[in-house]
Amino acid sequence: LIDVLPAWGTNLTRRVISKPKVFLQDSTMAASLVGVDAESLEMQISSSFTGGLLESFVATELLKQRERSAVPFNLFHFRDSTGKVVDLVMESRSREVVGVEVKAAVSLQGKDFSGLRHVQKLAGNKFRCGILLYAGKESLPIGPGRWAMPISTLWSV
């Protein structure tokens, strides 16, 4: 019913002392519990909940796809003491890292990529790519090893 994502860090101590992120596996149930329906999501009436629901949905989808992945990975989240955040961090057994940021917006701003840039810096040569999934329709390069992609990309890969 729930999933717990441990915190990602470049060392074991950071992973152990940081708080995990908990979310419901069923995003429809989560939306119902907070009183959000399809109409309010479309109209962004409940925008304070939209991002969290979308993030939970994407995390659940990635966890499902993990079972079929050619490269086994674990799923984490990242938040540091300065406020840098990456919603989801996939890490392979060889410690290769992919950062995934989720935005409910149809347009993007420069600040939306700061967390991915930070994780890229922390992971160093183990960083494979950073992906910002958003409600837009275009895939766009946003810097070395980083892309913005529509959320629908989850089903087209």
Residue ranges: model-predicted function:
Residues 135-157:
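Domain-level recognition of nuclease-like catalytic cores that cleave nucleotide substrates
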Residues 102-110:
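Short beta-strand-loop-alpha-helix junction that forms the active-site gateway
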Residues 79, 103, 133-134:
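Short beta-strand/turn micro-motifs composed of small residues
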Residues 67-68, 118-126:
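Arginine/glycine-rich "motif VI" loop of SF2 helicases in the C-terminal RecA-like domain
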Residues 32, 109-110, 139-143:
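Switch/connector loops and helix/strand junctions flanking conserved nucleotide-binding motifs
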Residues 1-97:
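Accessory nucleic acid-recognition modules appended to NTPase machines
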